[in-house]
């Protein structure tokens, strides 16, 4: 059975979240299409907020599961 492709906006959000939670710059956004770029930046903001709240490493595992960022 073929696996369905994920929504590109969801994938962009999750990639942005990963960048944000690791403290990387917003300027590293790889997307130029406005809707996808906005989804990435929204994910980055969420990740950055979690980074500031101390949800990194093992403390942030439950948050990654909420966002389905872990398979």
Swiss-Prot record:
The keyword Cytoplasm applies. It is found in: Cytoplasm. This is Ribosome modulation factor. The gene is rmf. During stationary phase, converts 70S ribosomes to an inactive dimeric form (100S ribosomes). Its main location: cytoplasm. GO terms for cellular component: cytoplasm. Gene3D superfamilies: ribosome modulation factor like domain. Keywords: Cytoplasm, Translation regulation. One of its GO terms (biological process) is regulation of translation. Belongs to the ribosome modulation factor family. Pfam families: RMF (PF04957).
């Amino acid at each position: 059975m073929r696996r369905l492709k994920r929504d590109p906006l969801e994938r962009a959000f999750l990639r942005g979240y990963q960048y944000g939670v690791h403290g990387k710059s917003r300027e590293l956004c790889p997307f130029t299409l406005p809707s996808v770029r906005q989804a990435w930046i929204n994910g980055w903001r969420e990740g950055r907020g979690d980074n500031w709240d101390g949800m990194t490493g093992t403390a942030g595992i439950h948050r990654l599961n909420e966002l389905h960022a872990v398979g």
